Amino acid sequence: MAEITAALVKELRETTGAGMMDCKKALSETNGDLEAAIDWLRKKGLSAAAKKSGRVAAEGLVGVASAPQTAAMVEVNAETDFVARNELFQAFVTETARVALTVGEDVEAIKAAPYPGTERTVAEQLTHLVATIGENMNIRRARVLSVPQGVVASYIHSPVKPGLGKIGVLVAVESASEISALETLGRQVGMQVAAANPHSLDTDNVDPAALEREKAVLTEQARASGKPEAIIEKMVEGRIRKYYEEVVLLEQVWVHDGESRVKAIVKNAGAKLTGFARFQLGEGVEKGPESDFAAEVAAAAGLA
């Protein structure tokens, strides 16, 4: 049996909000498997958390750049927020996003590409910047979206400068409609993605493993009610619909009015969403408490 360490118990407590003894029991029952322990607690009704809290650890900036029918987004990390406010660093993030527009989203290809206005590559310019500022930096990831007709809109939450911030979103909108209207729609959808953090564009693209895991947890929760299997099945179906409303962009409630569905808004605009990307600075690495981005975006949309 795996050793149940204090650190493991602490991590499970922070992730789920469950009590120490419940966390110890969950880890014992699941042989120290953290993910399985989270599910065990949820099945017992002892966890309010449906997923790990993606705490933010890295500093730096997310940057976007656009061209007709395409857009790129990069995340460049630094050690401190002080560097993120440095104009040289900000310029590097902006130029790196522009390079990604040309060479694509492969980070190694971006690093090997010429850095605009110099005889250096992007990687060499980064090394030069590290030596100049005296702090380690890294191009963490990049994403490029394109459409054959329409726009790829971008949205930066609370930008420190145009195209630079800590949360960035790209939204691919296909349509023959007027470009300015599509850009407005795309920006509104971008705010939706920033606030609601969907995992999938539509129900067909939901991770099958994640869906089966959710069904298993919901079924166990429903069975705890003691109701007949036929009723349990209906309960699970309803809860899966609710799950889709949380994780699927097109099924979500439109944050701008609190009533409509995203899919209805897009359809009424005569458009089709073909993809989206969301970068949150340092996503997936734990740190201290972060601000409520959903509330901030709602405020920016005039709904708070």
UniProtKB/Swiss-Prot annotation:
Gene Ontology molecular function: any one: translation elongation factor activity
**Domain of life here?**
Bacteria
Q: Which cysteines are joined by disulfide bonds?
A: none
Q: Which UniProt keywords apply?
A: Cytoplasm, Elongation factor, Protein biosynthesis
Similarity annotation:
Belongs to the EF-Ts family.
The job of this chain, per UniProt, is described as: Associates with the EF-Tu.GDP complex and induces the exchange of GDP to GTP. It remains bound to the aminoacyl-tRNA.EF-Tu.GTP complex up to the GTP hydrolysis stage on the ribosome.
Q: What is the protein name for this chain?
A: Elongation factor Ts
Which species is listed as the source? Granulibacter bethesdensis (strain ATCC BAA-1260 / CGDNIH1)
